[in-house]
Amino acid sequence: MSNRNLLHLNINLKDSKNFTNIKFVCMGGCATRMKNFAFKFSKSSNIPLSEEYNCGKRYVLYMVGPILFVNHGIGMPSINILLHEMTILLNHADAKDYTYLRIGSCGGIDVDPGTVVISSVAINTNLKPFYEINILGTIIKRKTFADTTVINELVNIKNNNFNTISGKTLCTNDFYEEQLRIDGAICKIDKKKIQKYLNILKQSGIVNIEMESLAFYGFCNELNIKSAVICVVLVNRFNNKRNDTDYDIYPQILAIKYMCDKLLDYKLLDKKQCKNIVDHFTKEV
């Protein structure tokens, strides 16, 4: 096992010692966005950026001190592969007390664009809090509730740049039909039923829709990994309201503030570094 090559990350476990001090894995869908996130954190913290790990064609991975920045692609199968290989790597490195953060974008359920949603639980398309996988012909259900300690800490972070809420997240298997879009190649949805279903989601306490949280929380719950999903609303699905503002920085700011607080406690960053980092990110708002 010590000479095993992680197939999709293209990292050999003999090099796992490089990852022993990791405290956070910050993951998002887009490779370019995560690369830029890593570069900005490195510049503002004055911590050298590792060379890009040669992860092949599927993932990019950067290390800045105790943080890994990596893209997870689109959808549950892609993030699930990353979660498996990342966790194998960190466990082999004997990393301790690490946290996984997923940052990204979502659609709002009567929630306006620019609002940052911290997912308290991921809900499947049957409106149940389970991630279901088929192993040997048997459906295995894994709970998808968030780590309440992490969620409460994120909710309580002082922030004047944007609105932050916590609530249930609907996780779907695709972007078009399961998310009730009528502009896909296949569209057999009764338009009259869309608003009725959106109202059902709202009444169930669901505040946003995305495509990864179910697998993410199901995996992290199974292995007792501290975790949180932080997504910014790009469109309010109730009225399809959106604007041209680039909100990508919003979940990054919340993640940065949380990580800085924790790394200050770990004595892995000092107060000056934390201030520089937060100032660097918030000046873009």
Segments predicted by a language model, with ranges:
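Short acidic/glycine-rich loop or secondary-structure boundary segments that cap or lie
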Residues: 109-111, 125-127, 174-181, 238
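Metabolite-binding pocket within alpha/beta catalytic cores that recognizes anionic/polar moieties
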Residues: 1-156
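Glycine-rich beta-alpha junction loops
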Residues: 30, 107, 170-176, 215, ...
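Zn-dependent metallopeptidase/amidohydrolase metal-coordination segment
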Residues: 214-248
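His/Asp/Glu-rich mid-to-C-terminal helical/loop segments that flank catalytic regions of hydrolases
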Residues: 236-285
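Flexible, glycine/charged-enriched surface loops at secondary-structure junctions
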Residues: 46-52, 97, 161-168, 265-279
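Active-site rim beta-loop-alpha module in soluble metabolic enzymes
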Residues: 143-205
